[in-house]
A protein has these predicted regions:
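Serine-hydrolase catalytic machinery in alpha/beta-hydrolase-like enzymes
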Residues: 26-34, 39-118
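Catalytic histidine neighborhood in serine/cysteine hydrolases
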Residues: 193-209
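Short beta-strand/loop motif that positions the catalytic acidic residue
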Residues: 167-169, 174-176, 180
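N-terminal cap/lid segment of alpha/beta-hydrolase-fold proteins
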Residues: 1-39
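Catalytic histidine-centered segment of alpha/beta-hydrolase-like enzymes
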Residues: 206-220
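Acidic catalytic loop of the alpha/beta-hydrolase fold
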Residues: 155-156, 178-183, 208-209
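Short alpha-helix in the alpha/beta-hydrolase fold that links the catalytic acid
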Residues: 160-162, 179-193, 215
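Gly/Ala-rich beta-loop-alpha elbow adjacent to hydrolase catalytic centers
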Residues: 125-133
Length: 240
């Protein structure tokens, strides 16, 4: 017997609440969801949308990735709150750092993933989270397996910072919604032109927030294609 996977479906995983400390002394809170039946083949390390606009570790794409990818694709999901951000998991210490101080949060999360033996980490940012990656993660290219950018606005990222990724030794993929509020396809092509090696994937009919099951599945399938290709496309039902 199978049951359709919907926006509220929570599939089996081994879930662990975590906390870790940044180099400037703040304790951040998060969660790791591990596959329950098999070893993880890769890790999705998420950086969430803008805290001052309601972004947190439970922003819906990130939450649904945690609910689905461990069971459907043997992908571990690491999600956490940036400094000063509250979610049902708890509150990370500190205050919003305008995308600058969050460098320490990214560094600490990556170190925590390594400490816990999480395999093949991919940094996956959404909106503000993409800015933190583009600004601060290039120096970590030898520690990660790839980067996926969801709805990158390029508000805080300079052309020089984009260009620094042009020779990155890892795949970098940007998912660009057709009707994005901040960076639709044509401006995205121009904005990423300093780094032509970045793969731009245009998402037909999509918007910045990826609302609805069709857009959610598109994002999760694109993630799965990169992190565990044999598991794509993801099933839309679950055996119960």
């Amino acid at each position: 017997m199978t049951s359709p996977i919907t926006s509220t479906t929570v599939l089996p995983a081994r879930r662990e609440d975590i906390s870790f400390t940044t180099s400037d002394g703040l304790t951040l809170v998060g969660e790791i969801a591990w596959p329950e039946e098999h070893p993880a083949v890769a890790t999705a390390l998420f950086l969430h949308p803008l805290p001052t606009a309601g972004g947190f570790m439970d922003s819906h794409i990130i939450r649904k990735a945690s609910w689905r990818l461990p069971a459907l694709a043997d992908i571990a999901v690491f999600r956490f709150n940036f400094r000063g951000v509250t979610s049902p998991r708890g509150t990370s210490e500190g205050t919003f750092g305008e995308g600058l101080e969050e460098k320490h949060d990214l560094d600490a999360a990556l170190s925590e993933a390594e400490l816990r033996g999480l395999p093949a980490p991919w940094l996956i940012g959404w909106s503000f989270g993409t800015e933190v990656i583009l600004k601060h993660a290039r120096v970590h290219a030898d520690r990660i397996s790839g980067v996926i950018l969801l709805s990158p606005p390029l508000h805080r990222t300079s052309p020089e910072e984009v260009a620094s990724w042009s020779d990155a030794p890892i795949p970098v993929v940007a998912l660009i919604p057709e009707f994005d509020d901040f960076l639709p396809p044509d401006p995205a092509r121009a904005g990423f032109s300093p780094a032509p090696s970045i793969e731009l994937v245009m998402a037909e009919g999509a918007k910045h927030l990826w609302v609805g099951e069709t857009q959610t599945r598109f994002v999760l399938n694109e993630i799965t294609k990169r992190l565990n290709p044999p598991a794509a496309p993801l099933p839309e039902a679950w055996s119960v």
